[in-house]
């Protein structure tokens, strides 16, 4: 995972990852988006993240993780849907976008903006539990699988 606290630093890290044999890189843009949206310059986040995806030497997973699931982004799902939707419609979209299944289920705006724009991009639906192995792990996976749009199902937990 490459954290996108600074776009040029993230791009350097992606080049280093490629040189080490990686074929895919994850850009965690939630710290960047939180800082820019929180400062009232959310439009700059669209530009910066677009530059990140467009300049990466590797296909990327784009993640703007919400606070409830271990990320830094505290804004709304409508803005994240707009971010993902704009990038999915660009000339250099990410290979995957990672969206929390809880957000996917609660936000019609996120589903409409992302689900209708996927094209060649794959959707990763994810769930995170940092307290341990979820007792409902298999039910959660089944619930996630019902969302036919997902190319990848991801569950992260502390073992």
Q: Across the structure, where does each feature detected by a protein language model lie?
A:
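Active-site mouth loops of central-metabolism enzymes
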Residues: 1-11, 66-79, 126-135
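Alpha/beta enzyme core
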Residues: 8-24, 80-95, 141-149
């Amino acid at each position: 995972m490459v954290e996108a606290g600074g776009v040029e630093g993230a791009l350097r890290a992606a080049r280093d990852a490629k040189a080490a044999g990686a074929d895919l890189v994850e850009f965690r843009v939630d710290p960047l988006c939180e800082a820019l949206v929180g400062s009232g310059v959310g439009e700059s986040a669209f530009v910066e993240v677009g530059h990140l995806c467009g300049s990466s030497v590797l296909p990327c997973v784009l993640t703007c993780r919400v606070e409830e699931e271990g990320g830094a982004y505290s804004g709304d799902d409508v803005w994240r849907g707009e971010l993902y939707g704009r990038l999915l419609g660009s000339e250099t979209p990410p290979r995957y976008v990672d969206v929390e299944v809880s957000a996917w289920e609660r936000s019609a705006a996120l589903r409409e903006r992302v689900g209708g724009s996927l094209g060649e991009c794959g959707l990763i639906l994810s769930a995170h539990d940092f307290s341990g192995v979820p007792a409902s792990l298999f039910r959660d996976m089944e619930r996630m699988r019902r969302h036919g749009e997902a190319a990848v199902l991801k569950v992260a937990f502390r073992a």
